[in-house]
Amino acid sequence: EGDVIATGINGFGRIG
């Protein structure tokens, strides 16, 4: 879950 802009270490991120 998340957006491409909010990618993290695992390639997933969250906006908020």
From Swiss-Prot:
Its EC number is 1.2.1.12. Induction: Expression shows a diurnal pattern of oscillation across the 24-hour light-dark, with increased levels during the dark period (at protein level). Up-regulated in the early and late stationary growth phases as compared to the exponential growth phase. It is an enzyme of class 1 (oxidoreductase). NAD(+) binds at R14, I15. Keywords: Cytoplasm, Glycolysis, NAD, Oxidoreductase. Signal peptide: none annotated. Its main location: cytoplasm. It is found in: Cytoplasm. Pathway: Carbohydrate degradation; glycolysis; pyruvate from D-glyceraldehyde 3-phosphate: step 1/5. It catalyses: D-glyceraldehyde 3-phosphate + phosphate + NAD(+) = (2R)-3-phospho-glyceroyl phosphate + NADH + H(+). GO terms for biological process: glycolytic process. One of its GO terms (cellular component) is cytoplasm. One of its GO terms (molecular function) is glyceraldehyde-3-phosphate dehydrogenase (NAD+) (phosphorylating) activity. Catalyzes the oxidative phosphorylation of glyceraldehyde 3-phosphate (G3P) to 1,3-bisphosphoglycerate (BPG) using the cofactor NAD. Belongs to the glyceraldehyde-3-phosphate dehydrogenase family. Homotetramer. This is Glyceraldehyde-3-phosphate dehydrogenase.
